[in-house]
Each structure stands twice: as C-alpha cells, then as structure tokens.
Curated annotation (Swiss-Prot):
It comes from Brucella ovis (strain ATCC 25840 / 63/290 / NCTC 10512). Belongs to the UPF0178 family. The lineage of its organism: Bacteria, Pseudomonadati, Pseudomonadota, Alphaproteobacteria, Hyphomicrobiales. This is UPF0178 protein BOV_1904.
Length: 161
C-alpha cells in the first residue's frame, strides 16, 4: 500500500463486506490502491487492479487493529464495525459503512452509544435480531458515498498515487 501522506487509499474490513466488487470498480476508475484486510483468506478477482490482500492472525480484532493502525487522512475505511469506525475517524480517515452511511466525528458518538445500548438490550434478551438485511438500495447508497468521499478528498488536495 502506498503510504504517502497526500495520497488516497481504500482500507476494507473485508471478512463480511458485501460491497468488495463495488470497491474494486470504483478504485479502478479512480486509479486508487485498495487494501483488503481479513482474518482469513479472501479471493480477489484477477481483473481487480491495485488490490493488496492482508491476512492477519491472532485475536478476533486483529483485522480491526491493522486497519486502525494504518488509518490516516486520505484513507477511506470501509467497515460495518462501529468501534473500528471510531478508531479510524480519530486517525483522520474517512469512514463509510457498506450500507452507504458516512460516519463523521460529529455522528460517531451517538452511533457508538446506540450500538452499545442495543448490545446491552440483546444481552438482556430485550431485543432479538440484528440489523436489516443488506438490500440493493444499500449497494447504491454505498457507491454514492464512496464516490463522494473520494471527490471530497481530491478537493482537499489528496490525489491518486
């Protein structure tokens, strides 16, 4: 992964990411490097350009730790993991959930508090189930959010390497 401070890169929490194919297409269009980080082997299509695979081992949070450690201004982090989103934002990265939700410093506190509350309610048996299933509108929202994040970074002076 190119780690020049003024370049754009995409870091993907890949184990359960439903939008990897979309990330590859957008990255290719913008000539951006992508790092797929996972706890196990993830296949990357041959035609995907500039994609690096990082397989981490160890604890369940090893992929999150790797992504948080490599987050920086100019990085776009794609994750559904709220604590990881918070850590990446602290490092100055742009963060997008696979459903297209853009996390910011001003929204992550409430999002993290809601996540923690729902975890507590699930543990107490008050709430069952989880988030809604991934839908086509989520894929479309994600593509829009990723393009928007890249455009904003380019306007801020970051560039493709």
């Amino acid at each position: 992964m190119e780690n020049e401070p003024d370049t754009i890169c995409i870091l993907v929490d890949a184990d359960a990411c439903p939008v990897k194919a979309e990330i590859y297409r957008v990255a290719e269009r913008h000539n951006l490097p992508v790092v797929i980080v996972a706890n196990s082997f993830i296949a990357i299509p041959r035609e995907a350009q500039r994609v690096e695979r990082v397989v981490v081992s160890g604890n369940l949070d090893a992929a999150d730790d790797w992504i948080a450690e490599h987050s920086r201004p100019g990085a776009v982090v794609v994750t559904a993991d709220i604590p990881l989103a918070s850590r990446a934002l602290e490092k100055g990265a742009s963060v997008i959930a696979p459903n297209g939700r853009i996390h910011t410093q001003s929204t992550i506190g409430n999002t993290l508090a809601t996540r923690n509350l729902m975890d507590s309610l699930r543990s107490a048996g008050e709430v069952t189930g989880g988030p809604a299933p991934f839908a086509p509108k989520d894929r479309s929202a994600f593509l829009s959010a990723l393009d928007l994040a890249i455009v904003r970074l380019k306007r801020a002076g970051f560039h493709a390497s």
